[in-house]
Amino acid sequence: MAKVESQAGELQEKLIAVNRVSKTVKGGRIMSFTALTVVGDGNGRVGYGYGKAREVPAAIQKAMEQAKRNLSKVELNNGTLHHPVRGVHSGSSVFMKPASQGTGIIAGGAMRAVLEVAGIHNVLAKTYGSTNPINVVRATVDALVQGQSPAQIAAKRGLRVEEILG
């Protein structure tokens, strides 16, 4: 599962997957490792990173650095989403919808780690198609970034928030 580390910058770090890969050359195989990580501040910022190196710790470090560089802002509504969202990347498709207080994170695998570090506490989520962790993480972040608050939608349409909410 995901390994959690806390840091001075108040960013939560989670290691989602480590994979051994090899390159075949004339003299044999060259082994290396890849790492997939997510980081977030637990308050609406989330990023993912993918690192590759000859040793596991170096791959994890590269992935964490990349994740910290790629932070995205997510609009939250009291620990859940404002509206249902769908994200797609390659063969993976994810669907997430807001849940009432006390529901928890109903999601599996790599998607759960992304939602936890983003600061989402109540959500219903489902992965369709490929469950490859890299594609699921990218689709999840894509879906979260698409989410908009009623204030953003009202500004876009030139209306007041009360008119949007009905």
Curated annotation (Swiss-Prot):
Domain of life of the source: Bacteria
Signal peptide residues on this chain, from the entry's feature table: none
Pfam families: Ribosomal_S5, Ribosomal_S5_C
Molecular function per GO: rRNA binding; structural constituent of ribosome
One GO term of the biological process aspect: translation
Alphabetized UniProt keyword annotations: Ribonucleoprotein, Ribosomal protein, RNA-binding, rRNA-binding
Domain S5 DRBM, residue spans: 11-74
Statement: the UniProt record of this protein carries the keyword Ribonucleoprotein: yes
Entry annotated with the keyword rRNA-binding: yes
GO cellular component, one term: small ribosomal subunit
Gene3D superfamilies with a match to the protein in the record: 3.30.160.20, 3.30.230.10
UniProt xrefs under PANTHER family: MITOCHONDRIAL RIBOSOMAL PROTEIN S5
Function text: With S4 and S12 plays an important role in translational accuracy. Located at the back of the 30S subunit body where it stabilizes the conformation of the head with respect to the body.
Family membership noted in the UniProt record: Belongs to the universal ribosomal protein uS5 family.
Domain comment quoted from the record: The N-terminal domain interacts with the head of the 30S subunit; the C-terminal domain interacts with the body and contacts protein S4. The interaction surface between S4 and S5 is involved in control of translational fidelity.
Assembly description: Part of the 30S ribosomal subunit. Contacts proteins S4 and S8.
Protein name, as recorded: Small ribosomal subunit protein uS5
Organism field: Aeromonas salmonicida (strain A449)
